[in-house]
């Protein structure tokens, strides 16, 4: 009977110890699986930073529940990650310079602490008073406010803090002292504001030099101001005046100008871009070709003569426009504009492709709904064409009687019309 009682006691002790000891074996397992295991074992909520990636290898036959957190942090730090904060905790890149961490203690100092407080050779992790809280962002992207919120938190406390964004639900996750988090909603209300959108309408066109382009019915009585303060009644006078290449106009100059250009045989519309972008965000549009350019060639003794090779780099050649608008409180728009009109040259003087480039880059201040005229970029094209009677033009001496050569010079000027309109946030 005594022997049976002893056996039952030993069995119960084995079951009891097994229920508390944690056994884990992971070989090159994803780090997020290790985090999931820890969360299930402890019941703690854990937020994983987007830059936390990699694998872990862990073999442990006996991890007591009271040591799980320290064991988990030790594994994270061995892989250059760490867990900070609480309720919930945040896993991020390990920063040994943070005030939340201290250096690894020597063995003589570790003996002064309870052996159950940390695994042998591990770290002592002091508890801090940070609280983790989430904040819903309603009008802008949460990730755009990270630096602003970090500045607010760090300017109000010297303690460590962390700010992360959850892009899927547009949340900010902030780990900081509680008094800072209590004041954060009031600060967020001053930066989480609706953002206006700006509609950019453009017209890129060429006019042959010397041709009078009639914009009289297009511009009509639409008055404008040429840069420099000179008033004008018609867009025509700006284009035809000596050196006139930019001005600011009110009214529907852009739409009416498109009609005028379509009826003129000496003008050519290159592009009519339309871009809608948020205030403070870049928008761009382009159309053209992706042209290969030879950047290197290997032949002769340094390469296989039967299989020479060359390196090629592709670049976009065509019409493009990029804008960076900012809507001001008074109804003005500060606009960064870059417009390019590139083309392939027909010249055969070079061994590779030749491109003609014309570009405009500037920063202007417009009123809502105004139209800006930029331009004055002149392009010269000299072309020669040989023609003759087949066979007869190839006969020496007398062949000149049956052939001819014609030379032509073309000169065109590039203009860009840009209209900016604020689309108010609802």
UniProtKB/Swiss-Prot annotation:
Keyword Membrane belongs to the record: yes
Which parts of the chain are coiled coil?
none
Keywords annotated in UniProt: Host membrane, Membrane, Signal, Transmembrane, Transmembrane helix, Viral extrusion, Viral release from host cell
- Cellular location of this protein? Host membrane
List the transmembrane segments: 317-337
Q: Which GO terms describe its cellular component?
A: host cell membrane; membrane
**GO annotation, biological process:** protein secretion; viral extrusion
Q: Which InterPro entries match?
A: Bact_Secretion_Sys_Channel (IPR050810), GspD-like_N0 (IPR049371), GspD/PilQ (IPR001775), NolW-like (IPR005644), NolW-like_sf (IPR038591), T2SS/T3SS_dom (IPR004846), T2SS_GspD_CS (IPR004845)
The topology of this chain with respect to the membrane is:
Single-pass type I membrane protein
Q: Signal peptide: which range, if any?
A: 1-21
The protein's assembly and partners: Homomultimer. The channel is composed of 14 G4P subunits that confer a barrel-like structure. Interacts with G1P; this interaction results in a complex that spans the inner an outer host membranes.
Role description: Acts in the assembly and extrusion of the bacteriophage by forming a channel across the host outer membrane. This channel is just large enough to allow a newly synthesized phage particle to pass through. Extrusion is a process of concomitant assembly and secretion and takes place at specific assembly sites where host inner and outer membranes are in close contacts.
Give the protein's recorded name: Virion export protein
Q: Specify the species.
A: Enterobacteria phage fd (Bacteriophage fd)
Q: Which gene encodes it?
A: IV
